[in-house]
């Protein structure tokens, strides 16, 4: 993609490759007056600023707290916005200084070169699709803010969860800068997993009511079971752990180094334990994204199939270990709920664990003989296609079960699962009610509001102004969010904004999935994003965790651009 500006900013500047394939060493100037040393120096400065910001966001952001859970939303938001605003300020200052130097020393040739590449960006690439979609998302959010009856609240998000236009703008700008100008470094993966493991371990100790941070002393006893670690509400906590789980699973599955494989496996085990002990139903969706999506990457090789079987066996082993701990320390643990409780109560669980480890061990020992006897088991395109058929069949069965339980009124057939299959106002802690009423409110919007919504993060204002009494009477609750990120965006930034956001997620994940560089952190970012995206169908975007999603998308796309062929360095 020789005309792409986003590729231009991602290549090693010790070599400069022009569109004709000619290479200039860093000690020479091109015919157009470009200086490789100047470009390398500029690139180093920009990458230094971005790397420091990533270091703070990957390590400090997940762990920072102030006054227990009482102000955790404000604390995370303030840290994130200060970090990004500081990064933008330094980047702007650098840009001005470099532009002045370029003007004085090189007659502005580098600046003109940069802007010429931006104007001639290749519009046929998946990179451009993601960039265009996120731009539509931002423009729609800006128009939504201007058209909102609560313009100030829509901009700052101070009447909601601080997810107004200001925060959305920080997401988009940081995405553009990191994905376009940051040269990927493998340490970002290690930092993310290290801080993530700490968050998970703290959450695990909270499950055993150790309260090592002392946060539970400052909240009501009735709230102890639903606030944990350095994240807060268990729904938000398991959303974050899902990011760690998806990232570590992909890294473990693709790693060749024995020591790093052990490290990623330990992170995976910790994340499995943490997400199960988090006792939130959105964990099932994160796991569905992980175990449903990994085979499309791993089933191409025998090694990948073996790693997938190992991951599956590990999950059931962790569940079994938690069950044993629950029986050994019944007075210490909070206890499992919902589907995980059904699984641990399954009497044959130990045999399930042994079965999966037996399958994994057997496959590891015998897989080399499958190529002739059973080619579909040795990995490859056919194996992936078989999995795709099984996935389609599984989704079909699930759809039938929903139809059978709701339309055919055969819910009794499904025993403990009927609480998940029967969709009513009470489904998902009254999510059924707020989803239904949210869509009804959207249908009542005038055309302009259907397109651009009520204003970013103004759902609470909308709900209190229209359905407050009905909401309290029906559920006994006051909802300030739709408990579904996509429905939330549909009402607050309209069809245009929510479509732009969804298209951005799909385009970015498609780009990462098609990457052929072999960089495992790109696939780690892909599965972290996929786990988050699926669980957000029962959750909302908050500045406690959502910044990490945008970081995953940013570094994943940066990796894709850096590894793309025929790159042109412009910084």
Regions found by a protein language model. Give the residues of each.
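Alpha-helical transmembrane segments of multi-pass inner-membrane proteins
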Residues: 25-29, 33-67, 85-100, 135-151, ...
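Short, hydrophobic transmembrane alpha-helix segments
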Residues: 65-79
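Non-cytosolic membrane-interface motifs at loop->transmembrane helix junctions
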Residues: 76-77, 155-164
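Transmembrane alpha-helix boundary signature
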Residues: 96-123, 144-156
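TM-adjacent membrane-interface loops and short helices in multi-pass inner/ER membrane proteins
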Residues: 233, 425, 429-479, 493-497
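Short, charged juxtamembrane terminal tails flanking transmembrane helices
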Residues: 565-571
